[in-house]
Curated annotation (Swiss-Prot):
Belongs to the PAL/histidase family. Its EC number is 4.3.1.3. Its main location: cytoplasm. Contains an active site 4-methylidene-imidazol-5-one (MIO), which is formed autocatalytically by cyclization and dehydration of residues Ala-Ser-Gly. The lineage of its organism: Bacteria, Pseudomonadati, Pseudomonadota, Alphaproteobacteria, Acetobacterales. This is Histidine ammonia-lyase. There is a cross-link at A145-G147 (5-imidazolinone (Ala-Gly)). It comes from Gluconacetobacter diazotrophicus (strain ATCC 49037 / DSM 5601 / CCUG 37298 / CIP 103539 / LMG 7603 / PAl5). The gene is hutH.
Amino acid sequence: MMTDSLILTPGTLSLADLRRLAFSAPSVTLAAGVRDTLAQAARSVDRIVADGRPVYGVNTGFGKLARTRIADANLRDLQRNLVLSHAAGIGAPMDDRTVRLILLLKANGLARGHSGVRPEIVDLLLEMGNRGVLPVIPQKGSVGASGDLAPLAHMTAVLIGAGQARVDGRVLPGDQALRAVGLAPVELGPKEGLALLNGTQASTALALVALFDAERVFQAALVTGALTLDAARGTDAPFDPRLHALRGQKGQIECAALYRALMADSAIRASHREDDERVQDPYCLRCQPQVMGACLDSLRHAASVLLIEANAVSDNPIHFAETDEMLSGGNFHAEPVAIAADLMAIAVSEVGAIAERRLALLVDAQMSGLPPFLVRDSGVNSGFMIAQVTAAALASENKTLAHPASIDSLPTSANQEDHVSMATFAARRVGDIVANVRDIVAIEYLAAVQGLDFLAPLQTSRPLAGAAAALRARVPFYDRDRIFTPDIEAARDLIADGVPTLLPGIADVLPRLEV
């Protein structure tokens, strides 16, 4: 049941709005006056059709068939056939969060009034999201130009009573899914099928879901990095604000400040401030602000690109009702999304890479000064030995997944669409990387708290003790070997819930995507 609401003023969604939509399901309604604007635009399209002017996708074929003129009597069939023929995706269906966001983003773009669709189309998109009619959209089949055609065709198929949708956990034919919640299919008018299919909403939604999940994993990795620093009895000297001010990198400065806040009153840190023969810590401890700060800056840049795209008109042709014009362009080309997703992939992979190195340090008795593999009676017990191997496997997998997708292109539609972005895959695989890094950070979380337990009675800082206590409420100390996977899953769930839930006292100082 909906417990909150969002009024959609087209083109004005904020990162906070999008984050909220990614993690919850507010009821969305159009702002006042938007339906009148859409109705005026639809009447303009009718005038263009009546004038008999050839307009791509309105009274012509599509792609390589753009020069084929379509008779007025066939214009509605043209739009329906477009949807059916383009619903050619394959693979597992996208998750509910992504599909709900696709519906909202498509409504947001169409509602700006430059696509020539009737208000009924936008109303139905929003009501499908509000009432939980979520089209079954296969993950694979889009090259990110001309828009996300196949995914959006599967979305649109449900609007016209075809395709399939999930409703209350059941998969139903499109018309039955709509009627199950009191909605009815629509018949598409001129331009409407093309407007629904053309656009970057699928790749943008995939990227946004991955981005907001990455934000939570990033914040958790800051906490686990501080836990590891204390468990390994590292020095806080490299976090001195003077060092970071001299470099001037914004993300680095913010991350260093958070590490200082997390470790401020640690008795462990104070215990080895004097008479410690170690001059410098390994890079995975010492260079955390530099690495994590660069990742933060990269994620923020990606967020700024995706925010623009979430509010964009990425249709083609684009309609200008005030002059009854249709202009063919290339706003459907998802290159901005693809490059932003590639940057996210690199940044999130690096968060996992340095976390895995910190974990490797903890299990190495010579590096950490802790029991081998963080368990008593090592030899009889293997402790964290294979958990670290799992983290290494995930980090190595990410190296391949982080290869840029945007630098690849294959021509389609008989070379009419001869350069494509690969944005949909670029965005989808970021989700895979985020999932891998969440597990790496979860294993580090387990290891760091285990390491801190060995340092008792010395206590870590209050914030870090809170993080350790939250884990220990679900996962007991490793006094002997046991099956590890359930513990990793428990730590992963804590991370997925978000650090503000884990440590409400530091929520205000956590770096976020907003600059």
